[in-house]
Structure formats: structure tokens, C-alpha cells
């Protein structure tokens, strides 16, 4: 009986994941047709040694005002700055999904903010050479 219940739970989980992927694909199509620059950000959270959760979000390209708020807030709290910056730029349809994800994995906003900053030109490597 436990195996049957476990199979039902796994099946329900797969159904939910399939629905999420369908929703993301529909949103991608919607925003691909618009003038707005929207990017897909996929992040994987390692829950434990055997489990990983993958999340896919769509973000608008950050505007200068959003970046300025991020830099201003960073001096007080990197966590708050990353969270605000991430929520500033998520598409409206995924705001609740992001909120739920952040409740469970609060550090995810730091990873996402890093990717958003790279859209604005943050580089891993910058070199200087004396002439």
C-alpha cells in the first residue's frame, strides 16, 4: 500500500513539474513576441547530496534605476539588495512563484542578482595593462 501511495505522490509531482514547464514555455512565447527584452534565468539549488531542484524564471533586462537602487542598498545589506533587485526585474506573471521559492530558498536571490548584473556588464575578468 505504501508503494502505491508513493507512486501517486511521484506522479502528482511530475504533473506539477510538467505544468510549470508548460507555463514557462507559454510565457516565453508571449514575451518573444513583445518588444521588451526578457531573459530566461535557470538556477539549480542543491537541496542535499542527492537532490537538486531546478527553477526557471523570466526576467526583464534591468534598467539603470533598478541597478542604482541595488548599489545604494548593497552598503546596508547584500541580501536585501539582491532580493529587491530580483523582484524589481521578474516578469509580473512569475512574481508569486518567485516569492514562494524565496521563502524556501532565501539565498537564491543572490545567485539570480549575479546573473542579472552580468546582463548589465559585470564581468568575471577585467584586465589592465600598462602601456
Please give the residue ranges for each predicted region.
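Short, surface-exposed, charged amphipathic helix/loop patches that serve as local interaction elements
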Residues: 51-131
Amino acid at each position: 500500500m505504501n508503494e502505491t501511495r508513493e507512486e501517486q505522490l511521484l506522479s502528482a509531482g511530475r504533473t506539477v513539474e510538467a505544468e510549470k514547464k508548460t507555463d514557462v514555455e507559454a510565457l516565453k512565447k508571449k514575451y518573444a513576441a513583445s518588444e521588451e527584452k526578457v531573459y530566461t534565468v535557470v538556477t539549480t539549488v542543491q537541496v542535499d547530496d542527492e537532490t537538486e531542484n531546478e527553477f526557471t524564471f523570466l526576467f526583464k533586462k534591468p534598467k539603470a534605476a533598478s541597478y542604482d537602487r541595488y548599489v545604494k542598498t548593497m552598503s546596508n545589506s547584500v541580501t536585501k539588495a539582491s532580493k529587491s533587485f530580483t523582484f524589481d526585474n521578474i516578469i509580473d506573471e512569475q512574481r508569486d512563484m518567485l516569492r514562494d521559492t524565496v521563502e524556501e530558498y532565501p539565498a537564491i536571490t543572490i545567485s539570480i542578482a549575479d546573473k542579472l548584473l552580468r546582463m548589465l556588464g559585470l564581468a568575471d575578468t577585467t584586465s589592465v595593462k600598462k602601456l
